[in-house]
Design a protein with these regions (language model features):
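Conserved catalytic or regulatory cores that recognize and/or transform ribose-phosphate-containing ligands
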Residues: 2-130
């Protein structure tokens, strides 16, 4: 399962044997495009299910209630990242200013940052999220 995730953080060397291995029990924050994506809850839910099946505790910003300002969401999400062991970026993370900020913040505070491989995300989610 580890082959479906590659490390994108250049700040710290990858701990490949530990990153997203089954049974590692990491606290994982999921980042990706929410604003402007009508199916964001489904997309984040699939990622959460897959990571939970791998034994991780998932911090999912798509579960936050609607009705707040972007700045409020970012403060909450940064706090969630503070609690996380690593951040997983969904393939569309570059399309989101919020996800780009989350990546930069996570790297700044020394968190591992990994990205789900675009070419294999569906296969990854199908195999792990059964």
């Amino acid at each position: 399962m580890i082959e479906y995730i590659r490390v994108v953080s250049k700040q710290r060397p990858a701990k490949r044997a530990f990153d997203m291995q089954v049974g590692a029990h990491l606290r994982v924050y999921v980042a990706g495009k929410i604003t402007g994506d009508a199916n964001y809850r489904e997309k984040f839910s699939k990622a959460e299910q897959a990571l939970t099946a791998m034994g991780h505790c998932v911090l999912n910003p798509a579960n936050l209630p609607s009705g707040m300002e972007q700045g409020d969401y970012m403060r909450i999400c940064f706090s969630m990242i503070d609690c996380a062991d690593c951040v997983v970026l969904l393939p569309d993370w570059r399309e989101s200013s919020g996800a780009r900020l989350e990546r930069a913040y996570a790297e700044k505070i020394g968190k591992e940052v990994v990205v789900a491989d675009q070419g294999r995300i569906d296969e990854f989610l199908e195999k792990v999220g059964r």
